[in-house]
Regions:
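A conserved beta-strand-loop-helix scaffold within acyl/acetyltransferase catalytic domains
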Residues: 6-75, 118-126, 132-266
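Aromatic (often tryptophan-rich) hydrophobic motifs at membrane interfaces
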Residues: 96-105, 219-339
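Active-site/acyl-donor-binding loops of N-acyltransferases
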Residues: 2-5, 13-17, 27, 67-68, ...
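A short, internal acetyl-CoA/4′-phosphopantetheine-binding micro-motif in the GNAT/acyltransferase core
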Residues: 82-91, 157-158, 258-267, 295
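A gly/proline- and charged-residue-enriched helix-loop-helix capping module
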Residues: 85-137
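Hydrophobic faces of well-ordered beta-strands that scaffold small-molecule active sites
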Residues: 79-81, 114, 289
C-alpha cells in the first residue's frame, strides 16, 4: 500500500515547500510550473493554489500543485495542474490514489473540473495508448491545452562549440553578426524591468500576441532571480534592443519571455540575447533548454509552411528552429469532470477563443 499525506490550504514558505521543490527538481518530468514560486506568482494574479502529495516510506513519491480560478465569465471554477501531476504512471495504485486526492481538493474548492497537462513526450507513448491510460483512470482526453503542447528542446550537455554546431548555419551567423555590429549583452537587474516591459509591449503589438502586465514580469523576476531566473539584455550604444527572461528548475531551463525592438533589427540583437540565455542555463548545470512553444503541427508541415504563415506561433518558429533543438510534443491534456454541464460550458467558451 502507498502511505499517503494529503494537505489542503495554503501556507507560507516552509520546510514542506523546500522538500516539494527538491522533489520537483529531481523528478524526470518535473517542471518550473510545479514549483512553489510558480504557485506564489500565480496567486498574485487571480489564482489560488493547493498541493497534494503522497509518501512511501517517508519519501515523496508523487503529487500535484493545483491552481484554481473562476473562468467562463465566472460560471466555472477550474482546477488546473500545469505540467503535472508528478506520478509514476506505471503504478496504477499510485495514480488512482493521487487522483483521489486531487478530486478531494477540487471538491473542497467547488471546482467543476480539473485539467491536467503532464509534461510527458509522445515519444514515450503513442496518443492512442495514452488516451486509453487517461480513460482507465477516469480522465477525459481533451484537445484543449493551456500550455503549448509542442515545443523545441535543446540538449545542453555537449560543449558550447557543439551546441553552436547543431544550430542552423544562419543562426550561428546571426549570433556572430550581432557582436560584429556592436551589440553587447549583459545580465539585467530589477532596474531593467521597465525597459524589458517596453520591449514586450512593442513585440506584442508587432506580432499580435497578448503580454502580461508589467507587475507580472516584475513579480516573476523577483520570485525566481537570481538563482532560478535571469534577464538578459542585448544593447546597442546603451539602448536595449532585445531581452530574454529565462527560468530554470532542476536540470531544465525554459525560455518563457522574449522581446525585441523594431529598431536596429539588422544587428540581430535577439540572437545575441538568446545565446546568452542558453549559455547561462548550461553554466547553471541545466541539461535541456525548452524554447517554450511552436505551432502544433508535425515537423514536415512546420518546415513546409513556416515561411508563409504569420499567425499564432508561426512567426516565432522560424526564430526558434534555428537554434537546433528537437521538436517534441506532449501527450496532451485531460480533464477530471465533476459537473458535466459546467464542463460543457467551459469547453464551449474555450472553443470561441
Amino acid at each position: 500500500m502507498v502511505a499517503n499525506m494529503f494537505e489542503l490550504g495554503e501556507q507560507p514558505y516552509s520546510e514542506a515547500d523546500a522538500e516539494w521543490d527538491a522533489f520537483v527538481a529531481a523528478h524526470p518530468r518535473g517542471s518550473l510550473l510545479q514549483t512553489t514560486n510558480w504557485a506564489r506568482l500565480k496567486s498574485r494574479f487571480g489564482w489560488s493554489t493547493q498541493r497534494v502529495w503522497m509518501r512511501r516510506d517517508g519519501r515523496l513519491v508523487g503529487g500535484a500543485q493545483i491552481l484554481f480560478r473562476s473562468v467562463a465569465l465566472g460560471i466555472v471554477k477550474l482546477g488546473y495542474v500545469p505540467h503535472g501531476p508528478l506520478v509514476d504512471w506505471d503504478d496504477a495504485e499510485q495514480v488512482d490514489v493521487l487522483f483521489n486526492h486531487i478530486d478531494q481538493a477540487a471538491y473542497s474548492r467547488g471546482a467543476g473540473m480539473v485539467k491536467i497537462e503532464p509534461r510527458i513526450w509522445r515519444q514515450e507513448m503513442g496518443p492512442e495508448e495514452w488516451e486509453a491510460l487517461y480513460r482507465r483512470h477516469g480522465c477525459v482526453p481533451s484537445p484543449d491545452t493551456i500550455q503549448p503542447p509542442r515545443t523545441i528542446v535543446l540538449d545542453l550537455r555537449p560543449a558550447e562549440d557543439e551546441i553552436l554546431g547543431r544550430m542552423k548555419q544562419k543562426t550561428r551567423y546571426n549570433i556572430r553578426l550581432a557582436e560584429k555590429k556592436g551589440v553587447t549583452v549583459r545580465q539585467g537587474t530589477a532596474a531593467d524591468l521597465p525597459a524589458f516591459n517596453r520591449l514586450m509591449l512593442i513585440t506584442g503589438q508587432r506580432d499580435n500576441f497578448g503580454v502580461h502586465d508589467s507587475n507580472y514580469y516584475r513579480a516573476a523576476y523577483e520570485l525566481f532571480a537570481p538563482q532560478n531566473a535571469a534577464l538578459w539584455l542585448a544593447e546597442y550604444e546603451g539602448r536595449p534592443l532585445a531581452g530574454v527572461m529565462v527560468f530554470a528548475s532542476g536540470h531544465s531551463a525554459a525560455y518563457l519571455y522574449g522581446a525585441s525592438s523594431d529598431e536596429e533589427r539588422q544587428r540581430m540583437p535577439a540572437y545575441a540575447a538568446q545565446w546568452a540565455a542558453i549559455r547561462w542555463a548550461k553554466a547553471r548545470g541545466c541539461a535541456t533548454y525548452d524554447m517554450w512553444g511552436v505551432p502544433d503541427a508535425e515537423e514536415p508541415e512546420l518546415e513546409a509552411a513556416f515561411t508563409d504563415n504569420q499567425h499564432g506561433l508561426w512567426p516565432v518558429y522560424r526564430f526558434k528552429r534555428g537554434f537546433g533543438g528537437e521538436v517534441v510534443r506532449t501527450v496532451g491534456a485531460a480533464d477530471r469532470v465533476y459537473n458535466k454541464l459546467l464542463h460543457r460550458i467551459y469547453t464551449r467558451r474555450r472553443g470561441q477563443h
